[in-house]
Amino acid sequence: MLLALCTCFLWLSTTDLWTVQAKDPDTDVSPRTPHRDLAPNNVDFAFILYRHLVASLPGKNVFISPVSISMALAMLSLGARGYTRVQLLQGLGFNLTKLSEAEIHQGFRHLRHLFEKESDTMLEMAMGNALFLDRNLELLESFLADTKHYYEAEALAADFKDGAGASRQINEYIKNKTQGKIVDLVSKLDSSAMLILVNYIFFKGTWEHPFDPESTRQENFYVNKTTVVRVPMMFQSGTIKYLHDRVLPCQLVQLEYLGNGTVFFVLPEEGKMDTVIAALSRDTIQRWSESLTTGQVNLYVPRVVISGAYDLRAILGDMGIADLFDKEADFSGITREAPLKLSKVVHKAVLQLDEKGLEAATCPRVMLEGASEPLTFRFDRPFVLMIFDHFSWSSLFLGKVVNPN
């Protein structure tokens, strides 16, 4: 999870998480900073995208980083013109009569800087975007400058006529950027491709209260009525925030990474996964956050490395963001040469979920004296995983874990 410096002070509004106020002298986080205007739109887009992806992959694991996808598509809009640009920004949830394009890009720039500032030795994260374009295209200097200024992104020439070679180039680029954490992102590419957008993120955080590795045991995970797999099940016991939801058929716990990371583990009742996912929204997260109880809990969570790799073209089309893939797309802000359309939007997110905390600096969980018998939360069947950066309430990750293996 994204981590804040120890000098941070945070005030969480009880009326609206998405206008959360914070103050940090190093990150200049204040109620009027640009990224705050993006938060509601980013979260709404996140849940819409997540539901479309889950619906397209029934019975499968799903794992995405919505905020990094939003950032990648907003970056692409710098080179879009006319209806292509309007459709793209509106598809991301932005009302262009209330938020100017300059404010959108400045907001993402500030958000990116915030993520970088919040990172330190307790966090391992690699996040970025890149455009790969036909090597014969001459790119506009203004586009290259803007993508660098706002998004720290690169536009690279590729020989798509050599599909295998272009794939190797992209995979090697991502491998180097993630120090080998993400490999083999794309396979052989179509020789007719001219523009590919690549977005990637790897994350490994540090628990505020770590799990004890000696307590991890091999246990059953019930994928469905006929499939059971063995998984390393982590365990911790102590005071934990939890909720038995009376509105939706689920229960959940909230854990914290050191710094700014808030993690929701959501366990739907058997057969109710679709009902819970359909109800995910800003209002639902708001209600959960306000309704959590702190109590004695025995918590069991699988140790996993979860990842998701997707070409988002079809999903974005279903969401009404289709013009950028059409031969009539207007990317004249990228090049003034031959008409250009987007061939692929490739996204990969990887999360390492293990026992580790900051061993020397982290206090163990406290068992309250005279407390009642601990409640048990055992995530041994499909569950929903959500990770937010609670400075910006950006949706870093949304996942559906069907099979941890």
From Swiss-Prot:
Keyword Glycoprotein: yes
SUPFAM superfamilies: Serpins
Transmembrane segments: none
InterPro entries in alphabetical order: Serpin_CS, Serpin_dom, Serpin_fam, Serpin_sf, Serpin_sf_1, Serpin_sf_2
Keywords on record: Glycoprotein, Lipid-binding, Secreted, Signal, Steroid-binding, Transport
Main location: secreted
SMART domains: SERPIN (SM00093)
Record site feature (Conserved cysteine within steroid binding domain), residues: C250
GO cellular component: extracellular space
GO molecular function list: serine-type endopeptidase inhibitor activity; steroid binding
Subcellular compartments: Secreted
Leader sequence residues: 1-22
List of glycosylated residues: N95, N224, N260
Gene3D superfamilies found in the cross-reference section: Alpha-1-antitrypsin, domain 1, Antithrombin, subunit I, domain 2
Domain of life the protein comes from: Eukaryota
Family affiliation: Belongs to the serpin family.
Function field: Major transport protein for glucocorticoids and progestins in the blood of almost all vertebrate species.
This protein's domain notes: Proteolytic cleavage leads to an important conformation change. This reduces the affinity for steroids.
Name the record gives this protein: Corticosteroid-binding globulin
Protein's organism: Ursus arctos (Brown bear)
Gene: Serpina6
